[in-house]
Amino acid sequence: MVKAKRSSAVKEALLYEGMQQLAENGYHGTGIKKILDVVNVPKGSFYNYFESKEVYVAQIIHEYNQQSVQLFDPLTNKSEATAMETLETLYKHMLDKYVAAECQRGCLVGSLAAEVGHSLELCQKAMQQNVTNWQTRLASLIAQGQREGSIRAELYHYVCRTLFHRYGGAAATKAS
């Protein structure tokens, strides 16, 4: 039996649509068939790209992480901005995105963690990688701010925790 040729464009479309569906419907509310219908891919072809729904969602989380890096890194590489200005710009962008989604979509990783955090090992590892990625970048930015004098040194741990959880907290508040 000849295996169907894998198209990177189809895989990217599946990842994109899956990310949209997961953000809107959560893990358990997202059906593979609906995603395949939107992308116009036969159901049997899904397994040419992904071994399982868990592998698929873990790759979506990885893609989400890459998108976060693409947002974060250019902001932090602006040498003319202070660390505090960069943090303000970053959070303004995230809040604008949240408002543009009519407060219906928060952090994909936060939403998935609440729904399937401990039950899907591959997804849990991908989510932890995302969290570590954000925490590392925020810690670096805060340390830069402390060197510049725009962030007080004694606030380090408090600021790190608060900034990291601030966006997720807004999303959780929406759900309650």
Indicate residue ranges for each PLM-predicted region.
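Generic hydrophobic, amphipathic alpha-helix propensity
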Residues: 10-19, 35, 60, 64, ...
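N-terminal intrinsically disordered/low-complexity leader segments
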Residues: 1-9
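Hydrophobic alpha-helical connector segments
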Residues: 59, 73-104, 157-163
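Hydrophobic/aromatic-rich alpha-helical bundle segments in the mid-to-C-terminal region
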Residues: 109, 122-132, 146-176
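Helix-turn-helix
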Residues: 13, 21-59
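Amphipathic alpha-helical packing segments from all-alpha helical-bundle domains
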Residues: 69, 73, 85-89, 118-147
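Short coil/turn segments at alpha/beta junctions that flank glycine-rich nucleotide-binding fingerprints
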Residues: 24-28, 105, 148
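Amphipathic alpha-helical segments used for helix-helix packing
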Residues: 86, 101-122
